Amino acid sequence: MMYVYGGGFMSFRVILDSCGEMTAEMKADDRFESAALTLTVGGEDIIDDETFNQAEFLRKVAACPESPKSACPSPERYMQGFEKEADHLYAVTLSAELSGSYNSAVLGKNLALENHPDKKIHIFNSRSASVGETLIAQKIRECEDAGMDFETLVDTVERYIDSQTTFFVLENLETLRKNGRLSKVKALVASALKIKPVMASTPEGNICQLDQARGINKALVKMVDYIAEKAEGSKDKILGISHCNCAERAELVKNAILERIEVKDVIVLDTAGVSSMYANDGGVIVVL
């Protein structure tokens, strides 16, 4: 699809790595595409694409004593996306602090530019994950549809990323514990006491612990408190929520947040493969 601005044709494409869930309307919009990560559970490779079966995946993870692993899309996969016809090409990746996807996309950009040096390509390090990537992709489309030039759009979206914070509470901490993502807070997680940490992204895109509570419901209440405290400028922002197999819990979180703050819109999505691996059964992720 192309739009005419000032007499010129402008088209764009956005590649999200598959940690970023796509809404139904994004899936129907051929300007968006997903670059699949590969998940490995007990020696079995599972492609994180439209064939991903969350319930089956969660069963396999629960039954496997080893931590599931993920492998990012190859530079060649990103290069293929960047070689498609479009005036402006973008990728949105999982936080570079958590995955090699960003570096792979940068390499893919460089490969594409060797063949097409005039292409305009930018890689956005989401410094987030899951629905955080979704919101960034939607921001790109909003800016493109408003007719922004490439450099202004990149600056606008990077500032939007700066303003984002990702919050999450997990019912099941096994994956994060096993793969060392939560090494700094291992000592604080006492499963016998049902202590659930309230987690958030750092400005650099790493994971930190904000708080903890006994039981997931109390932890979710604390998470909502932190979101309400940090909600400056929320009237102009979209609230993104993703959940792993717990739609009712996500709805309760959404309603609790909307009782406290005003937002432009809300999207609620079920986690795809990579996010399901980290959120695990019962996890809720909120991005604002």
Model-derived features: positions:
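Mixed-charge interfacial surface used for oligomerization/domain docking
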Residues: 3-13, 19-33, 38, 98-101, ...
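N-terminal glycine-rich anion-binding loop in soluble enzyme alpha/beta folds
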Residues: 13-72
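Conserved phosphate-coordination/catalytic loops
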Residues: 69-76, 214-217
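Active-site cofactor/cluster-binding pocket
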Residues: 73-89, 93-115
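A structural signal for short coil/turn segments at secondary-structure junctions
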Residues: 85-86, 116, 234, 261
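A ubiquitous short alpha-helical element
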Residues: 93, 120-127
